[in-house]
Regions:
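Metallo-beta-lactamase
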Residues: 2-18, 98-164, 248-271
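Pre-active-site segment of Zn-dependent metallo-hydrolases
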Residues: 9-13, 32-74, 78-89, 143-144, ...
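Active-site-proximal beta-strand elements of phosphoester/diester hydrolases
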Residues: 22-25, 39-43, 132-138, 165-171, ...
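Divalent metal-coordination and catalytic microenvironments
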Residues: 33, 43, 73, 80, ...
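Structural motif
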Residues: 38-40, 67-68, 95, 131, ...
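Active-site metal-binding loops of divalent metal-dependent hydrolases
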Residues: 44-46, 73-74, 138-140, 170-172, ...
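Metal-dependent catalytic neighborhoods of phosphoester/phosphodiester hydrolases
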Residues: 80-90, 105-109, 237-247
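Cap/insert and terminal regions of metallo-dependent hydrolase folds
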Residues: 95-97, 101-104, 173-265
């Protein structure tokens, strides 16, 4: 397991084959993907806070190789406001894509230059650093679009580049229409939360996500190339056993591939 600059050097030195995506897990819902010559950080959670069960594997100032930073929604373990100024400085050419609904507040809070922050909303598709990125609304308990603007505060992203298609749901529950939206893509790699939700967490302000069964019942019928469960390891009281997901997938959708990732350990997926 590599950390810090050693991890950055490994990412820089890794060369994906044609039609291949390389990926690294940083814990929680944070992933790094590399496709061809593009390095994308999704929800990098790098602030070292006391409540974390897993310490950050990279310091914000070590993140020197980003082309794109994707933030799915404005919670601290997804859009890590304290870390963003250092990330922006360390990767001076990186672009930051986030929900349009939170763009103004995030810019004001982080000081990241407005010309580097790209607002997204379902069903927009934008080309960022030559990478095609589509926004898909996520229901973090609720869809909750702004009644005036129609902007969704929580998004997932479909990333298309180099013949590979990757979906990161962000924090999301199943809602009517989600599967239909995703059917338009042949997704090679998907990252889904499995920590679920309940009354106790909701009443204490911890809004939830798919259960492991719901994540399976999204991934299975859509036949994702490889589905990675996540968002189950970082905070006490908001956890799940990832083997529950992989076992359920194996029983119910035996032809679908899943994997429990290891921290900062590269894995690869080929386009189908």
């Amino acid at each position: 397991m590599k950390v810090g600059k050693d991890l950055i050097n490994e990412i820089d030195g890794s060369v994906p084959a044609t039609g291949e995506v390389l990926a690294w897990w940083l814990g929680q819902h944070s992933f790094i993907i590399k496709i061809k010559d593009r390095i994308i950080y999704i929800d990098p959670y790098l602030s070292d806070k006391d409540k974390r069960l897993i310490s950050p594997f990279i310091k914000p100032e070590e993140l020197t190789n980003a082309h794109i930073i994707l933030g799915t929604h404005d919670h601290s373990d997804h859009i890590d406001r304290p870390a963003w100024p250092a990330i922006a400085k360390a990767s001076p050419s990186a672009k930051f894509a986030i929900p349009e609904a939170v763009k103004k507040n995030v810019i004001e809070a982080t000081g990241v230059s407005a010309d580097r922050v790209i607002g997204m909303n379902d069903p927009e598709t934008k080309e960022i650093c030559s990478v095609k990125i589509s926004a898909v609304a996520s229901a973090h308990e609720f869809l909750a679009p702004d009644p005036k603007t129609g902007f969704y505060p929580c998004l997932g992203y479909v990333i298309e580049y180099g013949g590979v298609t990757v979906y990161h749901s962000g924090d999301c529950c199943i809602y009517d229409g989600l599967a239909s939206k995703l059917k338009k893509w042949k997704i090679d790699l998907a990252f889904l939360p499995i920590n679920g939700r309940d009354a106790l967490r909701y009443t204490t302000g911890c809004i939830g996500n798919m259960t492991f069964q719901e994540a399976a019942d999204l991934a299975g019928p859509l036949n994702f190339g490889l589905t990675i469960p996540s968002h189950y390891d970082m905070f006490a009281g908001n956890r799940e056993n990832p083997k529950s997901f992989t076992d359920y997938m194996a029983a119910k959708y035996p032809t679908c591939k899943t994997m429990i990732p290891r921290y900062t350990t590269v894995f690869s997926v080929k386009a189908r």
